[in-house]
């Protein structure tokens, strides 16, 4: 896909420079946009919404591509969607992806954090739930679940995607719910080991909603 009329866009809160353009040259048969997260059904865009009025979606280039302030035209067939999954899904449904505005960022500027979750069952029952799934307190692990100043790990979990498969199960069962408003940190919140930006390159399925807080974002 070719991008022209590129202009700089500065993300003040992240101290990152992105590059504003649009998807007017998008070709679904050639261009690959990698998604990483499911949408929230209640937040999905339904109808009678003008795609032209959408805020730009934010996408990352792959590591082998670099944009800078001298770039006036740019071409790539692969991008990673960072922010704007609901807008992307709606534009796809009505075949108006070419009307989307976008901001492209370099892969080196991408940062990933984990959302906090609240538990919807009693603490003792939640800890028992973890134990029955093989998660026990152990602060020596690299991949696990943080709760009440303890890290719970499962020695059978070999990678971050196994952990997030378990997260999907308990999220789908309403054992945990993402905290969408910034309420600060609390030991009673649940947090999962964050993905690394490199994980976005290898992921081959959609994570459950609100698995990642990726910056820069609008």
Q: What do these predicted ranges mean?
A:
Residues 64, 72-218:
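Basic- and aromatic-enriched surface patches that contact anionic nucleotides/nucleic acids
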Residues 1-80, 86, 92, 96-99, ...:
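Short alpha-helix boundary/capping and kink motifs at helix termini
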């Amino acid at each position: 896909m070719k991008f022209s009329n590129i202009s700089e866009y500065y993300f003040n809160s992240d101290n990152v420079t992105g590059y504003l353009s649009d998807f007017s040259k998008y070709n679904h048969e050639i261009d690959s946009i990698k998604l990483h997260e499911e949408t929230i059904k209640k937040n999905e865009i339904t109808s009678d919404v003008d795609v032209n009025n959408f805020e730009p979606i934010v996408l990352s280039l792959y590591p082998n591509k670099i944009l800078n302030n001298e770039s006036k035209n740019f071409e790539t067939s692969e991008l990673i969607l960072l922010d704007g999954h609901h807008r992307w899904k709606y534009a796809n449904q009505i075949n108006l992806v070419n009307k989307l505005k976008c901001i492209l960022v370099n892969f080196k500027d991408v940062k990933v954090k984990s959302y906090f979750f609240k538990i919807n069952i009693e603490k003792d029952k939640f800890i028992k739930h973890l134990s029955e799934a093989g998660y026990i307190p152990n602060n020596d692990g690299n991949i696990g679940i943080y709760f009440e100043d303890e890290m719970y790990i499962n020695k059978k979990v070999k990678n971050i995607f196994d952990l997030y498969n378990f997260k999907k199960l308990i999220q789908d069962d309403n054992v945990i719910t993402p905290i969408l408003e910034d309420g600060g940190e609390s030991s009673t919140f649940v947090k999962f080991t964050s993905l690394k930006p490199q994980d976005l390159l290898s992921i081959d399925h959609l994570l459950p909603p609100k698995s990642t807080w990726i910056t820069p974002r609008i």
